[in-house]
């Protein structure tokens, strides 16, 4: 017999006779093990909870009602801007810091690192510069709502770069944030996009699109544009990097580079009275006695200590004798040896020559920076061969511990050589690798209001050779560019010092050393003659809102349109008219709560009038310059049915207004009259009051109609 499902329902016990067993929660199912494992006793599974016999009551949905303006417009702000570009030897510069100043033809521009923010104010400034397009106007719409954005990054042909973004407040911009724009630091962070060049990924997409929502703490509600315009919607950073040669330049033997600077014992000083050589003699070149013109070189072993005495400024003959004596005993030896013992020379040296020859004694180098020992005076007439102290550096040996990078200003001294101001340090970073500290250091100092002519880069590091013990950075040809050359044939009869430096090194002089250290770091661009370009496209989605219908252009007679010479196209680009969000005052608009029984309240009218009277000059952003200079009439407002919410431009003083004022006086006087005594008098009083109110409503309607006719001439066709 074939089994079939019974069509009738099986019999069940009555409700009062049903037997209920204790309900237990079903155990969770588990997968069958796929491999053998060591068996162990599991903890017994416990069942929690109870079975409900009655269905749980459905919770009512709580409806949160939010104000929605009656007039709304969707707006998409789309723009295409340069993200990064830099010229030769500008890899460590900040893009926006090196872009605003007008450059000569041979000067470089841009930078290899950058950061920025997007806000409604920034987007409006870009609109004024012509970098983006707004799909809808925000005139007469003071409310704004933000829905997110899309960022499109385009792949470059030869350059690779990194883009990092965040929409999580708090947003901050400080020195640590700027040094974090180094490529190695950017690769280690999250929320980044690595855009490799087309040479490395020839078959990849040409662009990458990122969808970014509103900030994490921003509520999806309506804001006043005046309060919302300065809110940061997105913060980002970008930098170029070198994925092909990240650690050592192509063709180089090692990671060591050389930069130049001045040691701490030869600080120059700016002064109104002395040149650098006189400061060097009276304050810094110590170990020279005043007892005699003859001083042994043995006394120079402990030079520049606080116990030594100061000496006078040496003349030209003494310098020449010192040169010959130095060349005759140019034999390297340990620091503690009796160096050049017994050689008596007149050494009251106080100029650049001392700074040059001191390198041999303290660093065991060649006694003359331009060649072998025994250099003649003729060889010294070529300052282009002079160079400051050289320091070797490698990023692979820099551990960061004990490093110090800052900017310092020069102490000024009085006419007696006494220091009047201490050496000030600012923008200091400690215990970090030098290749990381120098990122955008020059532009950060300029952004903090530091004058580059009065400040210098200060470095202390144990990972250079020789050790950079409180040095001032300079470039290699600093001496050749800043030495006042002798214009006389005989240097002995010169009025000024042949080797006098007329200024101390500043931030601009230290940029070469900063660039060398930055390019030595990992993943930084290594080629000196390299350049780069990167492009970004963005689309921000907004909604404008308000209680008044925004203005729309009215059709005009085509036969009365103006005529232009040349091609038949209008002189304007057809962009939407945009108001500055920071100028949209909500007090200058009427709102639904400003009406009482179909009429505007006096306080609302007074508020709007005061707000409009406060604006003495029209906003520069209402209409762009040249929009109404071609004979076109200004856009007229469309007819609105119902009660108007526009402030009247004139105060009519006709019969209706006089009647309304008289009625206001009589109504106040009637309130003080006595109450009718008989029912007949009461009925007459009510009838007169009804007639007055009817007449009052008619006069108010005619008065409002006249005001609307003055504001909108189109209504004359509807109300003759």
Curated annotation (Swiss-Prot):
It comes from the Viruses. Keywords: Capsid protein, T=1 icosahedral capsid protein, Virion. The keyword Transmembrane does not apply. Residues 546-569, 616-691 are annotated as: Disordered. Its main location: virion. InterPro entries: TTvirus_Unk (IPR004219). GO terms for cellular component: T=1 icosahedral viral capsid. Pfam families: TT_ORF1. It is found in: Virion. Residues 652-664 have a biased composition (Acidic residues). The keyword NAD does not apply. Self-assembles to form an icosahedral capsid with a T=1 symmetry, about 30 nm in diameter, and consisting of 60 capsid proteins. The capsid encapsulates the genomic DNA. Capsid protein is involved in attachment and entry into the host cell. Belongs to the anelloviridae capsid protein family. This is Capsid protein. It comes from Torque teno douroucouli virus (isolate At-TTV3).
């Amino acid at each position: 017999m074939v089994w079939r499902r019974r069509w009738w329902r099986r019999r069940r016990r009555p409700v009062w006779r049903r037997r209920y067993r204790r309900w237990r929660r079903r155990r969770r199912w588990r997968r069958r093990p796929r491999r053998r494992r060591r068996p162990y006793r599991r903890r017994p599974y416990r069942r929690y909870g109870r079975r409900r016999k009655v269905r749980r009551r459905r919770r009512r949905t709580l409806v949160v009602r939010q104000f929605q303006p009656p007039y709304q417009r969707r707006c998409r702000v789309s723009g295409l801007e340069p993200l990064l570009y830099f010229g030769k030897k500008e890899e460590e510069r900040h893009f926006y810091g090196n872009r605003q100043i007008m450059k000569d033809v041979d000067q470089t521009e841009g930078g290899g690192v950058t950061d920025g923010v997007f806000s409604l104010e920034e987007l409006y400034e870009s609109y004024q510069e012509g970098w983006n397009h707004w799909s809808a106007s925000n005139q007469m719409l003071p409310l704004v709502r933000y829905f997110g954005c899309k960022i499109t990054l385009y792949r470059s042909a030869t350059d690779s770069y990194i883009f990092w973004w965040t929409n999580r407040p708090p947003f901050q911009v400080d020195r640590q944030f700027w040094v974090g724009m180094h490529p190695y630091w950017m690769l280690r962070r999250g929320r980044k996009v690595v855009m490799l060049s087309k040479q490395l990924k020839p078959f990849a997409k040409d662009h990458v699109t990122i969808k970014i929502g509103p900030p994490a703490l921003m509520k999806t509600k309506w804001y006043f544009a005046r309060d919302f315009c300065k809110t940061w919607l997105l913060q980002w950073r970008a930098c170029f990097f070198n994925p092909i040669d990240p650690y050592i330049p192509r063709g180089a033997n090692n990671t060591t580079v050389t930069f130049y600077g001045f040691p701490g014992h030869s600080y120059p000083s700016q002064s109104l009275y002395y040149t650098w050589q006189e400061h060097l003699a009276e304050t810094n070149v110590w170990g020279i006695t005043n007892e005699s013109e003859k001083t042994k070189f043995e006394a120079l072993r402990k030079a520049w200590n606080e116990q030594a005495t100061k000496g006078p400024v040496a003349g030209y003959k003494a310098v020449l004798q010192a040169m010959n004596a130095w060349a005759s005993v140019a034999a390297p030896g340990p620091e503690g040896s009796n160096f050049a013992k017994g050689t008596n020379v007149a050494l009251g040296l106080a100029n650049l020559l001392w700074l040059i020859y001191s390198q041999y004694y303290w660093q065991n180098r060649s006694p003359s920076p331009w060649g072998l020992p025994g250099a003649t005076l003729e060889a010294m007439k070529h300052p282009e061969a002079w160079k400051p102290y050289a320091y070797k550096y490698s990023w692979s040996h820099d551990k960061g511990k004990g490093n110090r990078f800052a900017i310092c200003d020069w102490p000024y001294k009085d006419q007696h050589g006494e220091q009047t101001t201490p050496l000030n340090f600012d923008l200091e970073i400690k215990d970090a690798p030098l290749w990381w500290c120098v990122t955008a250091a020059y532009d950060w100092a300029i952004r903090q209001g530091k004058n580059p002519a009065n400040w210098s880069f200060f470095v202390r590091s144990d990972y250079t050779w020789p050790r950079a013990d409180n040095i001032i950075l300079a470039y290699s040809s600093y001496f050749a560019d800043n030495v006042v050359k002798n214009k006389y044939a005989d240097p002995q009869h010169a009025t000024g010092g042949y080797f006098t430096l007329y200024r101390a090194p500043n931030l601009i002089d230290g940029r070469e050393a900063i660039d060398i250290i930055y390019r030595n770091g990992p993943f930084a661009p290594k080629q000196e003659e390299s350049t780069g370009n990167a492009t970004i496209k963005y689309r921000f989605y907004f909604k404008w809102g308000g209680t008044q219908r925004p203005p729309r252009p009215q059709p005009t007679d085509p036969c009365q349109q103006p005529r232009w010479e040349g091609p038949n196209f209008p002189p304007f680009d057809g962009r939407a008219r945009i108001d500055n969000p920071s100028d949209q005052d909500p007090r200058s608009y009427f709102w639904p709560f400003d009406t009482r029984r179909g009429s505007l309240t006096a306080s609302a009218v007074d508020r709007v009038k005061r707000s409009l009277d406060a604006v003495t000059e029209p906003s520069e952003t209402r209409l762009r310059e040249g929009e109404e200079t071609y004979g076109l009439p200004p856009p007229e407002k469309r007819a609105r049915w119902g009660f108007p919410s526009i402030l009247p431009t004139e105060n009519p003083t006709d019969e209706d207004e006089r009647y309304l004022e008289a009625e206001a006086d009589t109504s106040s006087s009637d309130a003080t009259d006595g109450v009718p005594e008989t029912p007949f008098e009461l009925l007459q009083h009510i009838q007169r009051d009804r007639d007055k109110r009817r007449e009052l409503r008619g006069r108010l309607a005619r008065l409002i109609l006249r005001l609307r006719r003055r504001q909108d001439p189109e209504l004359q066709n509807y109300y003759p």
